[in-house]
A protein has these predicted regions:
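Short amphipathic alpha-helix with an adjacent loop that forms part of the alpha/beta core around
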Residues: 34-42
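Short, glycine- and charge-enriched coil/turn segments that flank and shape catalytic ligand pockets
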Residues: 20-22, 42-43, 66-69
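Short active-site oxyanion
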Residues: 1-3, 44-47
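Glycine-rich phosphate-binding loop and adjoining helix at the ATP-binding site
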Residues: 46, 52-85
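Residues that cap or initiate secondary-structure elements
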Residues: 20, 34, 53-55
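Short, solvent-exposed coil/turn elements at secondary-structure transition points
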Residues: 20, 31, 78-80
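Short hydrophobic alpha-helix segments
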Residues: 25-28
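Gly/Thr-rich phosphate-binding beta-strand-loop-beta motif of the actin/hexokinase/Hsp70
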Residues: 1-23
Length: 85
């Protein structure tokens, strides 16, 4: 199982999936990121996180996720300007 997390400025969205299916998904206010939102019976193999809400939110979430004992990969969103002249 993979846990995919998108930390936005207002909402944080997450999805629990494998290579074929989505098993669970939800969202919560990013200001509540310090609460326990991630409790699963399934073994998590990897966590992938995209974050635009700043280092503090990332650090809090990192602490909350350490109990999964799996790799955590942070991907950096890229601004795209292809459609602007």
């Amino acid at each position: 199982m993979f846990l995919l997390i998108d930390i936005g400025n207002t909402k944080t969205k997450w999805m629990l999936r494998d290579n074929r299916s989505i098993y669970e998904h939800d969202s919560f206010l990013t200001e509540d990121i310090d609460q326990d939102h991630f409790k699963f019976d399934e073994k998590i193999r990897k966590i992938v996180i995209s974050n635009v809400a700043g280092f503090e939110k990332e650090a809090i979430l990192k602490i909350k996720l350490k109990n999964f004992s799996c790799p955590i990969e942070f991907i950096k969103p890229q601004k795209m300007y292809k459609h602007f002249l």
